[in-house]
């Protein structure tokens, strides 16, 4: 009985990821003042690849640099190219410093950027913003 469970568990773990073959998709670039998250999805919103600045080994204040966003975009883009991505629509959200460099990095990989949208949410006088920094 115990062997049957372990054999079933082993076959479940050994199941290989199915590579999707998608020609075009959407690059969701979420930039904050602390980190940059890049998710590449198909048109339906199913994630094909993703990467973050912190996941690429950048820690602390270096996560929020344009270079860290560029490295994360290259990692996500290479995985997306393996899935067959040829062109992307970029949706950029947030005020961070890695906005432009992430899109440039995807373009330099040979992925055609067809459209760039700014989908940063703007409050209609909602929550009170954080107080100004005094240095």
Swiss-Prot record:
Q: Give any Pfam family that matches.
A: Ribosomal_S11
Task: Name the PROSITE patterns on file.
Answer: RIBOSOMAL_S11
An individual GO BP term:
translation
Q: Which UniProt keywords apply?
A: Ribonucleoprotein, Ribosomal protein, RNA-binding, rRNA-binding
Q: Name one GO cellular component term.
A: ribosome
Superkingdom per UniProt: Bacteria
Which InterPro entries does this entry report, sorted A to Z?
Ribosomal_uS11 (IPR001971), Ribosomal_uS11_bac-type (IPR019981), Ribosomal_uS11_CS (IPR018102), Ribosomal_uS11_sf (IPR036967)
TM segments? none
Q: Which GO terms describe its molecular function?
A: rRNA binding; structural constituent of ribosome
Q: Which PANTHER family match?
A: 40S RIBOSOMAL PROTEIN S14/30S RIBOSOMAL PROTEIN S11
As for what it does, the entry says: Located on the platform of the 30S subunit, it bridges several disparate RNA helices of the 16S rRNA. Forms part of the Shine-Dalgarno cleft in the 70S ribosome.
Quaternary assembly: Part of the 30S ribosomal subunit. Interacts with proteins S7 and S18. Binds to IF-3.
In terms of HAMAP family, this protein maps to: Ribosomal_uS11
* Similarity field: Belongs to the universal ribosomal protein uS11 family.
* Protein name per UniProt: Small ribosomal subunit protein uS11
Q: Which organism is it from?
A: Polynucleobacter necessarius subsp. necessarius (strain STIR1)
Higher taxonomy: Bacteria, Pseudomonadati, Pseudomonadota, Betaproteobacteria, Burkholderiales
